[in-house]
C-alpha cells in the first residue's frame, strides 16, 4: 500500500475568522495516521481567505475521511472540500 497527498480546502465562515488560530486548530486536529504537509492561504473574495491543507494519508479506501471529519468539526469552518489527490512515488 502506498501513500497519497490530498489537498483539502477549508473555507472559514467569514473574513473575521482568525486565520492563525484556525491554522493552529487544524494542526492540533490532524488525526492519527495522517501527516500534515503544509497549509497555504488562498484569497477568495471580499477579504475571505481559504486554507489549502495538504495532508499525506494511506491510499486505502476512505483515506481522507478521518481528516475531513476532523476539520469540518472546527468552530469557524463553513465547509471543506477535497480538491486534489495524488499518489506519492
UniProtKB/Swiss-Prot annotation:
Task: List the coiled-coil residues.
Answer: none
Q: Which InterPro entries does the protein's record reference?
A: eEF-1beta-like_sf, EF1B_bsu/dsu_GNE, Transl_elong_EF1B/ribsomal_bS6, Transl_elong_EF1B_B_arc
GO molecular function terms noted in the UniProt entry: translation elongation factor activity
In terms of Pfam families, this protein maps to:
EF1_GNE
The alphabetical list of record keywords is: Calcium, Elongation factor, Protein biosynthesis
Q: Does the keyword Calcium apply?
A: yes
Q: Which domain of life is it from?
A: Archaea
Q: Please indicate if the UniProt record lists Calcium as a keyword.
A: yes
Q: What range does the record give for the signal peptide?
A: none
Additional free-text comment from the UniProt record: Binds calcium.
Tell me, in a sentence or two, what this protein's role is: Promotes the exchange of GDP for GTP in EF-1-alpha/GDP, thus allowing the regeneration of EF-1-alpha/GTP that could then be used to form the ternary complex EF-1-alpha/GTP/AAtRNA.
Q: Which family does it belong to?
A: Belongs to the EF-1-beta/EF-1-delta family.
Q: Tell me what this protein is called.
A: Elongation factor 1-beta
The record lists the organism as Methanothermobacter thermautotrophicus (strain ATCC 29096 / DSM 1053 / JCM 10044 / NBRC 100330 / Delta H)
